[in-house]
């Protein structure tokens, strides 16, 4: 998925790049926005954006807590001192809202000369590649549908969703690369 906004602004600013870190999945939704398209999206919330008891799945804490200790407890040990892993926490604290993981109806050719081609930047969400037929308007390929199907088969969109920046390579990210990144000692 592409976590870059069309503005390229920092992640703590509305419509800026998608922040790295931990989000909570809050089900699936269908957007009415023309450029997002009809494929189901994954609804996400950040810490502090919503009730803390819900985000941390802990009914014993204050619903309005902004204590970073709770967020830090979700991170693997090698990420507890890695500043980018806290972007979602600080973006939520700054008032950032409404970040979802969605597809797109935009033509990849609009961004042919960009390093993120064939993906489309958004207004701050996570964008997944989809291809649509110019004549029929029907969807021909959807990585978003594959993502939704995978989340659904894994138990549904109720859990944590982790955003990490791998690199700018022009190739698909493999599961091995993700696990390597998560297990890498970052100091």
For the regions a protein language model found, what residue spans apply to each?
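Short cysteine clusters
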Residues: 125
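Cell wall/extracellular polymer interaction/catalysis modules
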Residues: 1-120, 134-187
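A hydrophobic, small-residue-rich beta->alpha segment in the mid-to-C-terminal subdomain
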Residues: 128-132
């Amino acid at each position: 998925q592409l976590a870059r906004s069309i503005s390229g602004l920092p992640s703590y600013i509305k419509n800026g790049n998608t922040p790295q870190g931990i989000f909570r999945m809050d089900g699936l939704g269908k957007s009415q926005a023309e450029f997002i398209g009809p494929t189901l999206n994954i609804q996400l919330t950040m810490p502090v954006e919503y009730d803390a008891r819900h985000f941390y799945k802990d009914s014993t804490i204050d619903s309005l807590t902004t204590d970073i200790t709770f967020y830090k407890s979700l991170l693997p040990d090698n990420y507890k001192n890695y500043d980018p892993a806290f972007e979602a926490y600080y973006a939520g604290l700054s008032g950032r809202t409404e970040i979802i993981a969605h597809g797109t109806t935009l033509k990849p050719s609009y961004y042919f000369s960009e390093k993120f081609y064939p993906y489309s930047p958004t207004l701050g969400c996570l964008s997944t590649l989809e291809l649509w037929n110019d004549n029929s308007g029907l969807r021909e390929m959807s990585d978003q549908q594959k993502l939704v199907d995978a989340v659904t088969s894994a138990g549904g969109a109720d859990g944590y969703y982790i955003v990490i920046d791998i690199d700018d390579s022009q190739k698909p990210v493999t599961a091995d690369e993700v696990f390597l990144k998560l297990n890498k000692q970052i100091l």
